[in-house]
Amino acid sequence: MALKQQRKQEIIGEYQTHETDTGSADVQVAMLTEKITKLSAHLRNNKQDYSSQRGLLKMIGKRKRLLTYIQKQNQERYKALITRLGIRG
C-alpha cells in the first residue's frame, strides 16, 4: 500500500525536525504509522490476504524498533511523538 506523493510531503512537513529533513526517525515512524493504518483497513475487508498481513507485521516491528531508538535518544521527543501520532494508550 504505497502512499501518494502529496500525502508523503504533508507527513514530512508535519514531522520534520529541520527544513531539509526527510528521513529522520520521527518522519519514518510517521510514514510507517500512515502505512499501517491503510493496511489495517485493507485487511479488515480482506481477511485472507496473508502476504499483506505479513507485511503489516514487518512494518509494525520496524516502527517499534524506531520508537525504541527515539526513546533511548530523547524521552521527551518520544512522548511527544506517540501523543501526536495517537499510538500506544
Swiss-Prot record:
The keyword RNA-binding applies. Keywords: Ribonucleoprotein, Ribosomal protein, RNA-binding, rRNA-binding. GO terms for biological process: translation. One of its GO terms (molecular function) is rRNA binding. InterPro entries: Ribosomal_uS15 (IPR000589), Ribosomal_uS15_bac-type (IPR005290), uS15_NS1_RNA-bd_sf (IPR009068). GO terms for cellular component: cytosolic small ribosomal subunit. Signal peptide: none annotated. Disulfide bonds: none annotated. Part of the 30S ribosomal subunit. Forms a bridge to the 50S subunit in the 70S ribosome, contacting the 23S rRNA. One of the primary rRNA binding proteins, it binds directly to 16S rRNA where it helps nucleate assembly of the platform of the 30S subunit by binding and bridging several RNA helices of the 16S rRNA. PANTHER family: RIBOSOMAL PROTEIN S15, BACTERIAL AND ORGANELLAR, SMALL RIBOSOMAL SUBUNIT PROTEIN US15M. Belongs to the universal ribosomal protein uS15 family. This is Small ribosomal subunit protein uS15. It comes from Trichodesmium erythraeum (strain IMS101). The gene is rpsO.
